[in-house]
Amino acid sequence: MAIRKYKPTTPGRRQSSVSEFAEITRSTPEKSLLRPLSKTGGRNVHGHITTRHKGGGHKRRYRVIDFRRNDKDGVLAKVAHIEYDPNRTANIALLHYRDGEKRYIIAPRGLQQGALLESGPNADIKVGNNLPLRNIPTGTTIHAVELKPGGGAKMARSAGASIQLLGKEGKYAVLRMPSTEIRRVDIRCRATIGEVGNADQINIRWGKAGRMRWKGVRPTVRGVVMNPVDHPHGGGEGKTSGGRHPVSPWGQPEGRTRKPNRPSDRMIVRRRRSNKNKKR
């Protein structure tokens, strides 16, 4: 994926960059795999804001992605097109199966139009093929990994993401996550070979607030510049630091939102490193 920069004809143009979409082979999606997608604007059924900074954005239709691929074991599929998906950072690939069915999958890096893919325990170790973890060699780079057998891919689905299969211990496979966390997963879970494509998406500079509004993202305002009626950090004469430990607009201490003692935490072998401890 190449990134295009523009001449600075306007302030927004000066800062922004866009993808050249060189991998995209078709601009119109498969109509049979589209579903309507309604917007909530961050509100619940009562009309109350439950998630701030959401609203507006361009109209979208949801592309139905096959995250399981377990009912197509042994059926060859041809990559008909690589397409853009507005609902995720990764591109998607349209597969035409030998039995006539069409399905979308996450497009891995290096997948070409016309390639033949397969899923199942006997599939080759080839980019785009889907296999159980017990049939994948140690050290292989994978993505779209299940947390529970048959539950569908949950991990490593965004652009550029990948997981490394470190080893197998009895009925578990040991995985290194993109966050550097090392986790055990049931060896019956399935994964797709390769890493997710469109890795340069992280380097795109949006350049102006308007492009974020097209994505449905509204402005984020700091509490210290609000009035006291709007935020605990608001008010004061001149610029202030808030005068207390950081809190939410409802007075809850900032941070520590991760749920402790989740059932899946017992599968973690080593916690992820903090940013300051990560190897550069």
From Swiss-Prot:
GO terms for molecular function: rRNA binding; structural constituent of ribosome; transferase activity. Signal peptide: none annotated. It comes from the Bacteria. Residues 45-59, 269-280 have a biased composition (Basic residues). One of the primary rRNA binding proteins. Required for association of the 30S and 50S subunits to form the 70S ribosome, for tRNA binding and peptide bond formation. It has been suggested to have peptidyltransferase activity; this is somewhat controversial. Makes several contacts with the 16S rRNA in the 70S ribosome. Part of the 50S ribosomal subunit. Forms a bridge to the 30S subunit in the 70S ribosome. This is Large ribosomal subunit protein uL2.
